[in-house]
């Protein structure tokens, strides 16, 4: 009789343990499936989006949405590279990435220097991003400096270098980069600050637009401070070297 009672009690307990084990197994199956989905999306979505934007302009970016939420508005006017002054890509190369035409999306010397500088002076973060890296960030990603975003940025950089090529990268860069609060792209900036289309910008005007790019919410194209004025002059002079040495020739179509 006692044995029968023990067996009767052990059966519900065994069923309970079985259900718990099944639940744990189901949870881990879900986790594995979720990881698989994330990996597949990470491998598929970036190439597809890069291919699409090889042919069409992005309607909006994450940064634009962020600024809209912050109340900055959005002035975004797409123009082809042919409809911009040639001084614009020259100024961008002079200021942001002198090896743009010869690198493959990454300037490892600049990255190493930036890392050493940031170790010595953590309160003054210095970037080592190329124009291609900045374009990948501006078009596809969110603002920030975390390592996850930088890793995704590197993957997008490889893709746009392979699929877009230098002319399209420069065209995209000059169309989506932020020149002021809610002002995106060279055409919107040219109309806002100089009351003319981007095709008619002078070298000095292009240099001033590019000069504010590191801190477009802090530095003003309309009322440039002394540092922006000095930076504009430096870029303007460096553009001569860019032209003479053909450092921006790869963007010609």
State where each predicted segment sits.
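Juxtamembrane regions of bacterial inner-membrane/periplasmic proteins
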Residues: 2-253
């Amino acid at each position: 009789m006692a044995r029968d009672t023990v067996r009767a009690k052990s059966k519900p307990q065994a069923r309970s343990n079985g259900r718990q084990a099944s639940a744990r197994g189901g949870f881990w199956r879900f986790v594995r499936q979720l990881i698989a989905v994330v990996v597949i999306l990470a491998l598929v979505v970036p190439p597809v989006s890069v291919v699409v934007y090889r042919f069409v302009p992005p309607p909006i970016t994450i940064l634009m949405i962020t600024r809209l939420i912050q109340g900055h508005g959005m002035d975004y006017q797409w123009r082809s590279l042919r409809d911009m002054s040639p001084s614009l890509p020259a100024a961008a190369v002079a200021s942001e990435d002198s090896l743009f035409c010869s690198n493959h999306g990454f300037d490892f010397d600049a990255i190493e220097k930036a890392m050493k500088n940031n170790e010595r002076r953590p309160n003054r973060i210095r970037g080592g991003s190329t124009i291609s890296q900045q374009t990948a960030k501006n078009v596809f990603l969110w603002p920030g400096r975390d390592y996850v975003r930088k890793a995704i940025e590197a993957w997008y950089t490889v893709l746009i270098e392979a699929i877009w090529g230098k002319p399209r990268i420069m065209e995209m860069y000059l169309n989506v980069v932020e020149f002021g609060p809610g002002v995106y792209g060279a055409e919107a900036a040219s109309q806002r600050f100089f009351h003319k289309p981007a095709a008619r910008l002078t070298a000095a005007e292009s240099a001033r637009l590019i000069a504010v790019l590191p801190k477009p919410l802090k530095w003003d194209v309309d009322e440039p401070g002394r540092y922006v004025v000095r930076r504009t002059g430096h870029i303007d002079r460096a553009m001569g070297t860019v032209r003479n040495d053909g450092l921006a020739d790869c963007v010609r179509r």
